[in-house]
């Protein structure tokens, strides 16, 4: 794995040719995440349950030096919204346990690609953590916006359509979303540590169930600001309804075909 830089902007690009060797289970490769195939992955870091129901191991085809896979169920065809509440809670707890271990990196990205259109090559339920040696430009820009703001834009989200509210979280359809039906799950408290993992897991499950009405593929990403104390972490969830095309690639500007005000009613 190496880095290259855009000769105009200096923006970093990760060069990882070994990722071309990833197995594509959608194209007939055997699933390396199923029970009985443990020798097809690097030695595990940890597991939950015996026999295991959650398993964590290094990514065999890492985009950076520190990259991990969290297989979230032993069942090949399981879905996150079908997990028992305590199982989903444990998945979220493991996210943050592993995040703390990898926090020596400049940035840690927790994300899920679910479905072929979302970028998954293996349909077996899993998420990933990637530690980066630099803070991505998007995170830098958002962190600077938090630092400039007179008050935190995520501590008061009343201007955004509310999908659901719990004691510790708000699930909203944000204005200015780049993608149709994009959602955020935002903690009410301005803090870097997650509150009530069971509550967060339940909202994630509800969001996944809602997104399945729209698309069979989705992504989620935990957006965090380890270098900016005024940052406010949140989860971004995007059902994949369109392919990013030439206009978006060429301009960096997105066209959203679903107004946020209409989304809350659908969910």
Predicted feature locations:
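Active-site microenvironments that recognize anionic phosphate/pyrophosphate groups
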Residues: 1-124, 130-195, 208-267
């Amino acid at each position: 794995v190496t880095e290259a830089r855009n000769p105009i902007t200096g923006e970093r690009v990760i060069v990882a040719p070994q990722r071309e060797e990833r197995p594509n289970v959608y194209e007939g490769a055997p699933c390396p995440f199923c029970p009985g195939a443990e020798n097809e992955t690097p030695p595990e870091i940890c597991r939950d349950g015996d026999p295991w129901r959650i398993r964590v191991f290094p990514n065999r085809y890492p985009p950076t030096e520190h990259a991990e896979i969290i297989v979230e169920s032993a069942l090949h065809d399981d879905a996150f919204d079908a997990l028992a509440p305590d199982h989903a809670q444990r998945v979220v707890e493991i996210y943050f346990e592993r995040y703390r271990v990898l926090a020596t990196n400049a940035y840690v990205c927790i994300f899920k690609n679910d479905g072929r259109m979302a970028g998954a090559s293996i349909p077996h339920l899993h998420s990933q953590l990637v530690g980066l040696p630099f803070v991505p430009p998007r995170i830098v820009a958002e962190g600077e916006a938090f630092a400039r703001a007179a008050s935190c834009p995520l501590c008061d989200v009343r201007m955004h359509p509310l999908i659901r509210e719990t004691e510790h979280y708000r699930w909203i359809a944000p204005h200015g979303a780049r993608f149709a039906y994009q959602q955020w799950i935002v903690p009410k408290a301005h803090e870097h540590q997650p509150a009530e993992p069971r509550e967060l897991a339940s909202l994630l499950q509800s969001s996944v169930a809602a997104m399945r009405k729209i698309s069979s593929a989705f992504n989620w990403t935990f957006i965090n600001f380890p270098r900016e104390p005024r940052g406010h972490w949140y989860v971004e969830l995007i059902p994949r309804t369109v392919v990013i095309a030439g206009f978006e690639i060429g301009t960096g500007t997105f066209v959203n075909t679903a107004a946020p005000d209409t989304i809350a009613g659908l969910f």
